[in-house]
Amino acid sequence: MPGDLNLKKSWHPGLMKNQKKLWEQEQEALGEHLKIKAKSEELKKEKEKQELIKLQYGDANNVPIKVKRELNNLNWMYDDSKSGNKSNSEFNDMDDEFLLGKRKVENMLSGNKYIDTKETSRFEEAISSSNNGDKNIQNDPLIRIKNEQLKKYQSVKDSGRHSSKDRHRSRDRSPNRHTFRHKSDNDKVSKHRHSSHRESRSGRSKSKSSHRHSRDKDSIDGSKDYSHLSQRDNTKTPSEFITY
């Protein structure tokens, strides 16, 4: 007997890939259910807290501002104290001073430098941090390198412009340029003269050839007339010669 042929079907639930898909869907549904349950418990606790505050203060207008902020989870926006992050900020300041070269390792280890632990507001802290950020940007070595590269590029560009201007001036002032111009002008004049002389010579030759042609034509016509007359004279009789 062969095995179950339905196992070869893609829709069969006995296949491992279908079982894996089913398990993943069940896990997603379970996670969503847990999130909803946790949120409902949180809302339930907030409602109980609000009821206790109402019982304690009575009217909502009598509730102090700090308690209202705690209920709305807005107390972190108005908390000016930095008791929790005091030690971390001190260590961060020391690290920044060491990286910027303002403090040596010996002083850090000995602890001779006095650290001001005065509490300040967040507004003052933000202003001081922005000023320190500007100073750090100005003292950044990468930015310095970039500025030096820009200066070098600008200097090379300016030097190229000056060199091109000097070249043009030297070309204008060079005597060879003027001599070349005079030579070119003289060549043009000589070419024009040669062309005019050639044209005049060609005109003369044409007139001579036409004169020769007319002379040849006249000579041919005269010879024809003379031959005709000779023929007429030959046809005369001796008596006509005598009378003539």
Curated annotation (Swiss-Prot):
Residues 164-181, 203-214 have a biased composition (Basic residues). Residues 125-244 are annotated as: Disordered. Signal peptide: none annotated. Its main location: nucleus. SMART domains: Cir_N. The keyword Transmembrane does not apply. Residues 27-57 form a coiled coil. GO terms for cellular component: U2-type spliceosomal complex. Keywords: Coiled coil, mRNA processing, mRNA splicing, Nucleus, Spliceosome. Residues 215-235 have a biased composition (Basic and acidic residues). Residues 127-139 have a biased composition (Polar residues). InterPro entries: CIR_N_dom, CWC25, CWC25_splicing_factor. It is found in: Nucleus. GO terms for biological process: mRNA splicing, via spliceosome. Involved in pre-mRNA splicing. Belongs to the CWC25 family. PANTHER family: CELL CYCLE CONTROL PROTEIN CWF25 (PTHR16196), PRE-MRNA-SPLICING FACTOR CWC25 HOMOLOG (PTHR16196:SF0). Associated with the spliceosome. This is Pre-mRNA-splicing factor CWC25. It comes from Debaryomyces hansenii (strain ATCC 36239 / CBS 767 / BCRC 21394 / JCM 1990 / NBRC 0083 / IGC 2968) (Yeast). The gene is CWC25.
